[in-house]
Amino acid sequence: MDYFEIMDTVCKDLGLNFNQEKYNKFIKYKDILKLWNDKMNLTAIVDDKDIIKKHFIDSIRVFKFLPLKDAKSIIDVGTGAGFPGIPIKIIKPEVKLILLDSLNKRIKFLNQVVLSIKLNDVTCIHGRAEDCARKIEYRENNDVVVSRAVANLTVLSEFCIPYIKVGGYFIAMKGPSVEDEITESKNAINILGGKIEDIIKVEDDEFNHNLVVIKKITHTSDKYPRKAGIVSKNPLR
């Protein structure tokens, strides 16, 4: 089975449209990622097959959360090399996408990808999550927030929940053992105006992890997120 067939099968299983044009964008994205990775550390995953399975398909499987298909605006917080945001955009080109990262060199890379594979309505922002969440143009202004960033769920929730509209969702891509994090984060999520709605298992020969789905129930207090550095050093309890 070639790469197109692998990705097409995954998309069909999720009820998603996949075609040659979308596939070509993924392949060009892969090539740009490998080229830039020689100059800066974007990913430790460099084999073509692994990039497709561990980055692209892993990102596409966020669509196991079905309401994502109806989202009109998505922000990817701590996007790194563009995962899962850019694969989501390729699959769902009509969505408005914001890619947020704290390293400017990554933003330069992302802007190059967006230009090269001709993605429309994508904004790449250089900034810290806790700072940008206080700006009126981003705060409580997105249907869905996604993040594959490596951070404790309590910390990640304070970074991400302020970006969501009331009634919207935060999808945290977490590893296979997430029970303790969920237990520890419930009060913080409640303080921030959210509620854990679902935990979706993502499992096959390559994957074993969870999508933690948090729904925004009420507005986030202006107290949150707290200033840069405090969120990680003193997590909400």
Swiss-Prot record:
Its EC number is 2.1.1.-. SUPFAM superfamilies: S-adenosyl-L-methionine-dependent methyltransferases. It is an enzyme of class 2 (transferase). One of its GO terms (cellular component) is cytosol. Keywords: Cytoplasm, Methyltransferase, rRNA processing, S-adenosyl-L-methionine, Transferase. One of its GO terms (molecular function) is rRNA (guanine-N7-)-methyltransferase activity. S-adenosyl-L-methionine binds at residues 78, 83, 129-130, 148. InterPro entries: rRNA_ssu_MeTfrase_G, SAM-dependent_MTases_sf. Pfam families: GidB. Coiled coil: none annotated. It is found in: Cytoplasm. Its main location: cytoplasm. Belongs to the methyltransferase superfamily. RNA methyltransferase RsmG family. Specifically methylates the N7 position of a guanine in 16S rRNA. HAMAP family: 16SrRNA_methyltr_G. This is Ribosomal RNA small subunit methyltransferase G. It comes from Clostridium kluyveri (strain ATCC 8527 / DSM 555 / NBRC 12016 / NCIMB 10680 / K1).
